[in-house]
Design a protein with these regions (language model features):
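A surface-exposed partner-binding patch
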Residues: 1-82, 129-182
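Compact, glycine/acidic-enriched structural inserts
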Residues: 76-117
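Hydrophobic alpha-helical interaction segments
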Residues: 105-139
Length: 182
């Protein structure tokens, strides 16, 4: 019964674990690993809402679910350099970001042109990037929105999150810097 409950409550997390192609794409180039959910520092949300680390990246960054509930909760990303931002509303939206624009951390201008330049560089190293992306999306039953839509949504969420989603370094009571600025 417990495993069935986990699957119902976290269907996308379960799907990632069950589909090797999706997990591989998310691991690279997505730099997203479900086994790295522990953050390097003690942190909390300014609002006092629950914060649950559920994944991380190779550079020490962490993805957190904010508040109570399942995979539809807002997702905050905190890097290891003291910066954080709300990046998605729900795991489905985060996975679309990671599939469409896995280089989002380097795409600071939020333009399709900048994303295309980064994609070209990634494609040099991963010639079958588009095929792998499509397979991962199909395995997770996700649509792939247009790059412009994904980038606009990321900027909207990150810059419009408000004070409730400010991450605080608990030992010093100091806020993390915004990862994404207006």
């Amino acid at each position: 019964v417990a495993a069935a409950t986990v699957c119902r409550m976290n269907p996308l997390i379960t799907a990632i674990r069950e589909h090797e192609a999706a997990a591989r794409f998310l691991a690279w180039p997505g730099d997203f690993d479900l086994d790295r959910g522990d953050h390097v520092e003690e942190v909390h949300l300014a609002s006092g809402a629950a914060l649950e680390g559920f994944a991380g990246d190779g550079a020490g960054g962490t993805y957190f679910f904010c508040g109570d509930g399942g995979e539809d909760r807002p997702v905050l990303y905190a890097d290891s350099e003291g910066r954080a931002a709300l990046v998605a509303i729900g795991l489905r939206e985060l996975l679309q970001l990671l599939l469409v624009v896995p280089w989002w951390r380097d795409c600071r201008a939020f333009t399709v042109q900048q994303s295309a330049e980064l994609e070209a560089a990634y494609t040099e190293d991963i010639p079958d990037l588009a095929v792998r992306r499509t397979r991962a999306a199909q395995a997770l039953d996700l649509e792939l929105p247009a790059t412009a839509d994904v980038m606009a949504r990321l900027r909207q969420i990150a810059t419009g999150a408000g004070e409730d989603y400010v991450l605080i370094f608990t030992p010093e009571g100091e806020p993390y810097e915004p990862l994404i600025k207006n």
